[in-house]
Swiss-Prot record:
Family in the record: Belongs to the TolB family.
Subunit structure: The Tol-Pal system is composed of five core proteins: the inner membrane proteins TolA, TolQ and TolR, the periplasmic protein TolB and the outer membrane protein Pal. They form a network linking the inner and outer membranes and the peptidoglycan layer.
Keyword Cytoplasm appears in the UniProt entry: no
Function, as annotated: Part of the Tol-Pal system, which plays a role in outer membrane invagination during cell division and is important for maintaining outer membrane integrity.
Lineage: Bacteria, Pseudomonadati, Pseudomonadota, Gammaproteobacteria, Pseudomonadales
Compartment annotation: Periplasm
HAMAP family registered for this protein in UniProt: TolB
Gene: tolB
One GO term (biological process): protein import
Pfam families found in the cross-reference section: PD40, TolB_N
Designated name of the protein: Tol-Pal system protein TolB
One GO CC annotation: periplasmic space
Signal sequence residues: 1-21
Amino acid sequence: MINLFRGLLVVLCFASAMVSAEEKNILVTSGSDRAAPIAVVPFGWQGGNVLPEDMAEIVSNDLRNSGYYAPIPKQNMISLPTQASEVIFRDWKALGAQYVMVGNITPAGGRLQIQYALFNVATEQQVLTGNVSGTNDQLRDMAHYIADQSFEKLTGIKGAFSTRMLYVTAERFSENNTRYTLQRSDYDGARAVTLLQSREPILSPRFAPDGKRIAYVSFEQKRPRIFVQHIDTGRREQITNFEGLNGAPAWSPDGSKLAFVLSKDGNPEIYVINLASRQLSRVTNDSSIDTEPFFGKDGSTLYFTSDRGGKPQIYKTNINGGGAERVSFVGNYNANPKLSADEKTLVMIHRQDGFTNFKVAVQDLARGSVKILTDSNLDESPTVAPNGTMVIYATRQQGRGVLMLVSINGRVRLPLPTAQGEVREPSWSPYLN
């Protein structure tokens, strides 16, 4: 068997007829039209001490990361207005900016008051104004909030910059001494905190739909078991204790169920458990490997990876019974499915025919066309922003596991700052407010 479901094989190691398709599917290898130029001018500051965060830089980076906007560098700006009355539109027209944002930060009673305004340069009209207040420690939160408000006003799509991310680090000190940590950070990798630390592997962390719980696989008992942990209190609950593989947990949209993979009856199959009643139901029943479940928004449809056709491809089925339907047809390897928020796009790990590289790709579910988003070689574990505009994934750079962000339109691709050691298994949170 080829290197089937690389992530699953890692778990298995720790634990101990092709379907035809019409050749109408299309492979696209790059993005197209350019992002809209936007200027986020450095915010004015009326206090004495230097602020710990650059608000304008955070807002600018957020808008850039979406793939919709191309920020104009500060050094190229002709003027630096900090309030609406100071904006000279000819300066921004000369730079080709479509939008310009200005802001001002004022200390007030131990807090910071931030006023901001966004303008359409061509029409010279204000399109958004607002204010937000908080403490020094909340500067990043306020910047992400401003970016969220601006993005939604300009695109009609709810911003996802105030969300969080989970990921796992593995720091090796010697042959038999590796420290694994489960981290939570801002979506952009900032402000990471440790939720769990172990000398045994941690895999497949997943946010619950309420953003208050997480599920993950831990080897702390020397074999894989699935746990649910409450983020605020740290309280944990063991969900599975079966022989063999216990892996790949996935939450139902209402948070009442978990789908996961068990090999207790032989080969890996997908099961669903009701977390209240603890009733366990088997979903797949096939001699192949079935893994990496992901719920559709209806709470009944499961997308998953299987080699039942000879090579890893993506299928979907109903948790209440019925056969599996193949979804992916382009390429000789498609795995680790995730859906966009509107369920029109499937994000996956893809390998083209005749190639050995694994890349993040998106498939238009209506047309079947596939677009490759990345240019790296060993991508894995894609996770999608709740608004569907960005993907975070794990890959390797210079021999080290790292996390990368790519916009769904392919315009932006950049590394995320994370801790030392191997970094893997990212998971994007739902909206948190």
